[in-house]
């Protein structure tokens, strides 16, 4: 019986790096780990409530956190930084609207553990968004939630990945009650090469749920990216 391992965790230290970088004594490690989770949850809640809609995804590729003694650095990699900056959030206390990024910064600052630590939050633009697995998975989820046929959605996602120029191969898998069928099944599509057993291959992976009227669909996306340590002519 085959055993499966997470493609990103399998490549840590080879082609993947941790998204959180900090050191802590053993008695304080759990508190800093919970703080990381609160920061990421704060960003996700802000995106779901104010940015993401039925026709627009947040397009956040990843969130990197670095901690020092008196400084917490949060870097948000997104396809459209202007979308996060231009979002307006209603302020109930003053009955006005404030800039969304300032609202997010204040909420993250409030989630930090007590101490005189400053927060430095930056937005970084992703040059080729549709070469990122998470952004492709969000796109597929939006299409499925809008009742677009799953085969058409997979073909369109593969086209977007190929147009980005950052994908040497892509595999998409969707599981659940597809097109409202009574019996759940798994369908997948692949184009190019996706060498999951090769550690030097730069594989990006994401699992994302889609909330449809027929239930939850599970979406998995694997992208074999161009920035791999393997040359195009090397055989595997």
From Swiss-Prot:
The keyword DNA repair belongs to this UniProt entry's keyword annotation: no
KH type-2 domain boundaries: 47-127
Q: Which NCBIfam families match?
A: rpsC_bact (TIGR01009)
Q: Which CDD domains match?
A: KH-II_30S_S3
Keywords for the protein's UniProt record, in alphabetical order: Chloroplast, Plastid, Ribonucleoprotein, Ribosomal protein, RNA-binding, rRNA-binding
Query: What Pfam family is a match, any one?
Result: Ribosomal_S3_C
User: Listed GO molecular functions?
Assistant: rRNA binding; structural constituent of ribosome
One GO BP annotation is: translation
The similarity annotation says: Belongs to the universal ribosomal protein uS3 family.
Query: Which InterPro entries does the record match to this protein?
Result: KH_dom-like_a/b (IPR015946), KH_sf_prok-type (IPR009019), Ribosomal_S3_C_sf (IPR036419), Ribosomal_uS3_bac-typ (IPR005704), Ribosomal_uS3_C (IPR001351), Ribosomal_uS3_CS (IPR018280)
The listed locations are: Plastid, Chloroplast
Q: Where does it primarily localize?
A: plastid
- The answer to whether the entry has keyword Isomerase is no
> Per its record, how is this protein called by name?
Small ribosomal subunit protein uS3c
- SUPFAM superfamilies (alphabetical): Prokaryotic type KH domain (KH-domain type II), Ribosomal protein S3 C-terminal domain
**Single GO cellular component term:** cytosolic small ribosomal subunit
Q: How does it assemble?
A: Part of the 30S ribosomal subunit.
